Amino acid sequence: MSKRDYYEVLGVARTAGEGELKSAFRKLAMAYHPDRNPGDKEAEIKFKEVNEAYQTLSDGQKRAAYDRFGHAAFSQGAGGPGGPGFGADFGDFMSDIFDTFFGDARAGGAAGARGGRAGGRERGADLRYNLEITLEEAFTGKTETIRLPTSVTCEVCAGSGAKAGSKPRTCPTCGGYGRVRAAQGFFAIERTCPNCHGRGEIIDDPCTACGGAGRVTRERTLSVNVPAGVDDGLRIRLAGEGESGLRGGPAGDLYIFLSIKPHPFFQRDGADLFCRVPISMVTAALSGEITVPVIDGSHTTVRIPAGTQTNKQFRLKGKGMPVLRSRDVGDLYIQVFVETPQNLTKRQRELLQEFDQHGSQADNHPESAGFFSRVKEFFDGLSGSGRA
């Protein structure tokens, strides 16, 4: 069965802390526990999946490896990180969970087998690879060569895990099901078979090349086509490029998760780009031209009209990002802000003071004049109301 992303399984963000992981695990383990869902195979699978995800993400080293390589970091053997059984921390939660099950408890009998046979064909796990690209690369598209470790079928034993001339035998403990059920007080607990570790079969004479796992780890090189117009967080699926299946099962898929590096000039909103550009006080007052960058590496000229104010926006049509799988292209918006001069010389100060003395407040600064006029009217109105 294909493995989902562990963070997705627990329903938490990749930045989730220990407390958030523990809370999510507790909630899901209670929801999918077999004693609350008797005979529900889907709940049984999810219960096992939740436990495996928590055992990985609650361990610092395993979590770091998983964040970098996904399921490929633990590709030796079936069942994921730490094996398919229950980890030590799981027992700490079970007492709390069992308290909530008391009303639904079912008296258990002797150990017994349950579930489908584990020894059949099994699809390989899906893999995740995080790829970071620049905004320019998202604009043009690119072909990226990646290298990743992954599990492939052992060529020596053809995936059986057994040495040439021998073959696995059915596990006598679980009868080939891979799981056993045992009574514990009022509760019946299902767990991975301790004898075959969930495989449903025993390999008496394991293959020397893979140690009985049926798969070996190899580093593969793949070419990934990143189309123009991709956005941050986009997922690219490469079918059949995940881990090899077990016992003749199909391979899983490889998912490329894209992230785009922050750009020093441009901010992106869909297919549109935004760029803040400083202009001088003189250019803003008298008009002029400025040269601005474009995402394709070129430059273009923007005409600044006289009297331009801070945050004035100019639209450059068709200078933004391409729309993914479309001929449409976004726009580039240039937002200017007027830079107040600093470290003025004596003569510059005199010129500015002369300008201020010879100008009309209403003509030169209509916004300021209008604002202070409205303030005066407001307070005059308050004074008139007080006298009345």
Swiss-Prot record:
Pfam family example for this protein? DnaJ_CXXCXGXG
Binding site residues for Zn(2+) 1: 154, 157, 207, 210
Name recorded for this polypeptide: Chaperone protein DnaJ
Q: Where is the J domain?
A: 5-70
The record's remark on the cofactor is:
Binds 2 Zn(2+) ions per monomer.
Superkingdom of origin = Bacteria
Q: Which organism is it from?
A: Methylobacterium nodulans (strain LMG 21967 / CNCM I-2342 / ORS 2060)
One GO biological-process annotation of the entry reads: response to heat
Which key words tag this protein in UniProt? Chaperone, Cytoplasm, DNA replication, Metal-binding, Repeat, Stress response, Zinc, Zinc-finger
Query: Which molecular function terms from Gene Ontology are attached?
Result: ATP binding; heat shock protein binding; unfolded protein binding; zinc ion binding
